[in-house]
Amino acid sequence: MSFPKYKPSSLRTLPETLDPAEYNISPETRRAQAERLAIRAQLKREYLLQYNDPNRRGLIENPALLRWAYARTINVYPNFRPTPKNSLMGALCGFGPLIFIYYIIKTERDRKEKLIQEGKLDRTFHLSY
């Protein structure tokens, strides 16, 4: 039984298991991968020791999660790229509600003023004539 030759899709990159570069790597690259794996395993072990400590007090601080949250929330402007869509959404969200509320108040006052001038509105508690 023969299998058809794998044809890579134009929409997706080649899987690592089918990439020839995965198996033909230099010793330096292998050493760097092993060092990264060792660091990752050490950090995971430290985290699990803190997580499963029965005498734990307070929260466990994950430095990677703190860096991610800082970059995501507090440090927005160095990573922000202004586009026409961002500008339009900012203008709509900033000035849109103000213009909408102004329009509602203005039309309501104009309608009331017109009714007062025609004498159709009963003003029982008016302060001025």
Swiss-Prot record:
What is known about what this protein does? Answer: Accessory subunit of the mitochondrial membrane respiratory chain NADH dehydrogenase (Complex I), that is believed not to be involved in catalysis. Complex I functions in the transfer of electrons from NADH to the respiratory chain. The immediate electron acceptor for the enzyme is believed to be ubiquinone.
Which coarse location class applies to the principal site listed for this UniProt protein?
mitochondrion
A single GO cellular-component term from the record reads: mitochondrial inner membrane
Q: Indicate where the modification N-acetylserine is found in the sequence.
A: S2
GO MF: NADH dehydrogenase (ubiquinone) activity
What's the name of the protein? NADH dehydrogenase [ubiquinone] 1 beta subcomplex subunit 4
- At the top level, the lineage of the source is Eukaryota
Q: Which family does it belong to?
A: Belongs to the complex I NDUFB4 subunit family.
